[in-house]
Amino acid sequence: MKTMTSAEVRQMFLDFFKSKGHTVEPSQSLVPVNDPTLLWINSGVATLKKYFDGSVVPENPRLTNAQKAIRTNDIENVGKTARHHTMFEMLGNFSIGDYFRNEAIAFAWELLTSSEWFEFPAEKLYITYYPADKDTYNRWVEVGVDPTHLVPIEDNFWEIGAGPSGPDTEIFFDRGEIYDPEHVGLKLLAEDIENDRYIEIWNIVLSQFNANPAIPRSEYPELPQKNIDTGMGLERMVCIIQGGKTNFDTDLFLPIIREIEKLSGKTYSPDSENMSFKVIADHIRSLSFAIGDGALPGNEGRGYVLRRLLRRAVMHGKKLGIQGKFLASLVPTVGKIMQSYYPEVLEKEDFIMQIIDREEETFNRTIDAGQKLIDELLVNLKAEGKDRIEGADIFRLYDTYGFPVELTEELAEDEGFKIEHEGFKVAMKAQQDRARAAVVKGGSMGAQNETLSSIEVDSKFLYEDKKAQAKLLVAIKDDELVDEVTGKAQLVFDVTPFYAEMGGQVADHGVIKNADGQVVATVLDVQHAPHGQNLHSVETISPLKVGETYTLEIDEERRSAVVKNHTATHLLHAALHNIVGNHALQAGSLNEVEFLRFDFTHFAQVSKEELAEIERQVNEVIWQSLKVETIETYIATAKEMGAMALFGEKYGKNVRVVKIGDYSIELCGGTHTQTTSEIGLFKIIKEEGIGSGVRRIIAVTGQKAYEAFKDAENTLSEVAGLVKAPQASQIVAKVSNLQDELKAAQKENDALAGKLAASQSDEIFKNVQRAGSVSFIASQVTVPDAKGLRNLADIWKQKELSDILVLVATIGEKVSLLVASKSLDVKAGNLVKELAPFVDGRGGGKPDMAMAGGSNAAGIPELLTAVAEKLG
């Protein structure tokens, strides 16, 4: 077995399959593109689903990749086990209807055992297979595997409901008896017992059958196109090759761990658990790559996952004794480890560090709040005579504030408290179940559409034409190829002026005419077929026949509106880079007839000043009437030109570059104006957040922009009339004067309210009652607003008349309730929650002051009567 670095292992895998005629697919963003079923790219095949379901046919049916992936179902296990990670790399080879079982098994055995490649000892490799899959067993024997190393496993069958399925065969490496102290041997593998001796390194899925839950598995029909999907975990391979005790004891993690040693002053040893070292090393990899790919910490979805990872890493840093912020300082080390194949971390190092640093600073403030919560919880439990912390409270501290259970235990034990673990486990399982339920299971191989996949004719899009003579090559009705169609159908022509929806630009609409100039069909939509042809969805008026020539005409007015928005989108993207920063990467776009929508990564709301500057800059470029050039060239040449490639998009060798003067240059396959002046005008309508770290701008161009400006002008005129400003330029001064007058009136009103409260207070505060050892005042009062209640409470505080004050008032149709407390035994927030239901209300607050709102004034007498009972 050869000694290799992780970079060499990755490259050898790719080089091997390249030598076998495979195309190397570049690693895609961790943030899925156009796949709502996934929170993250979670496997090597996840980015290739379009090939397996037949929606796109690859240029080469043999593919290989090294794909970064994230899985966070069991974050708690990271650091506890030898091989659990949140971010990992999958190496894979894939066949889309090309080779199958025989070649896949032969490739695997050659790569692993040949002296030219990894050179693993054959006697160290064990293979599992599906018992009924005799073909796989026989093939392994044919390539040279010792039959005693072949282990049948009933679970070796890949299946997710109805659809493509098939047996799989897994390859394990035997690390020897040193990792099998009980000398259990092959039983560990045969009975699927968790162990550190037999390590799975490769899984080969043979997608062979069309699963149907209604029939026995043995009767599943075979798929028309059989596929191969394999996955090899890079971290596991490197661990075996480098002889690490765990995956963390390799060149993928050790440089990070060495930096953590410097920060903490503590020493990592593979012979001890060192959980905190492993957690930090794992989580900083995930954070660096995910943030580099455009995901940002937040309170939901991907953002919540990143926030949780960061907080967990910070807390483990504190367990190691690291003071202050430290996580961002590890990013350069992550970048250097991975730079040979993933240069993006170093390229975006400053931005990644900025985000992590800012988030860590925020969390450090949160930690202080969490510490106070723990202290407060322990004080309350002591006061109640309890000696244990309930599981629900532990989970709240863990889930909301990121406190590891171990840290809560330590703090509790220092104060003599026990921990109720069962409640924590129940709450944790409920959260995991919710997380799993939120992800729609998407199999690696979706349903195959044979009709569309079988179409292999050429179909060319004519960029410059609005009308074209075209021969009808293919007609599809109800998923069947036909020679003549009526009603709704799908058509493919040899050429077309109709743009198929792609890259955020909507499809063209229009009509199809016969030789006599009569309209025979309306084009409702255009999409790309699996082999890339332009597939026209039409509603026919008269029958259309395959082989005949028709005139295709697009709706030019619609196209004109769409291209204005598309070209403006390029200008907006460039302006965002200039004004907000280069981290503002496109996260989605839509170029419609009425408007354009642009989503981009950014960690804060775009300020009004920034939006104004973006709008000004885009319009300035429009008025310069810059030429919009399209250049067809090689991808390498385009990148040398500085063309911006959109992350997550897949580009072939030949690409189309759209260049707008010296202002913008992007890879783009869409249609555009000839000059920027054709856009006319650009106006931003809205800027908003649509998810964690993703902002959205909606804008309009041309006539729609003019209408938007006109609407704003009309609104301004209406406001001028309301404030009696003769000219629009005087509105600001008029409104400012009105605000000053309003403040003066409010001040006078507050003074009167204070006097009213003082006049009422003597009468209200006369009736001091007792409930046990607690004195209280409970009264219904007349006040204009909630502030009046607070004024009375302020007077009560100064006079020190009782321990508790309860005031209730009807304000309009609503009920307002105030509770104030000077007693350490009675918390206002708790008492207001008990009283509010009497008036159909709810509320809360601090231990000394709390308020609630309700809707049932009829419940006020009962509420006041209940105060003594609640305090007694």
Swiss-Prot record:
Binds 1 zinc ion per subunit. Zn(2+) binds at residues 566, 570, 668, 672. It catalyses: tRNA(Ala) + L-alanine + ATP = L-alanyl-tRNA(Ala) + AMP + diphosphate. It is found in: Cytoplasm. Pfam families: DHHA1, tRNA-synt_2c, tRNA_SAD. The keyword Aminoacyl-tRNA synthetase applies. It is an enzyme of class 6 (ligase). Keywords: Aminoacyl-tRNA synthetase, ATP-binding, Cytoplasm, Ligase, Metal-binding, Nucleotide-binding, Protein biosynthesis, RNA-binding, tRNA-binding, Zinc. CDD domains: AlaRS_core. SMART domains: tRNA_SAD. GO terms for cellular component: cytosol. One of its GO terms (molecular function) is transferase activity. It comes from the Bacteria. Its cofactor is Zn(2+). Its EC number is 6.1.1.7. Signal peptide: none annotated. PANTHER family: ALANINE--TRNA LIGASE, CYTOPLASMIC (PTHR11777:SF9), ALANYL-TRNA SYNTHETASE (PTHR11777). Catalyzes the attachment of alanine to tRNA(Ala) in a two-step reaction: alanine is first activated by ATP to form Ala-AMP and then transferred to the acceptor end of tRNA(Ala). Also edits incorrectly charged Ser-tRNA(Ala) and Gly-tRNA(Ala) via its editing domain. Consists of three domains; the N-terminal catalytic domain, the editing domain and the C-terminal C-Ala domain. The editing domain removes incorrectly charged amino acids, while the C-Ala domain, along with tRNA(Ala), serves as a bridge to cooperatively bring together the editing and aminoacylation centers thus stimulating deacylation of misacylated tRNAs. Belongs to the class-II aminoacyl-tRNA synthetase family. HAMAP family: Ala_tRNA_synth_B. This is Alanine--tRNA ligase. It comes from Lactococcus lactis subsp. cremoris (strain MG1363). The gene is alaS.
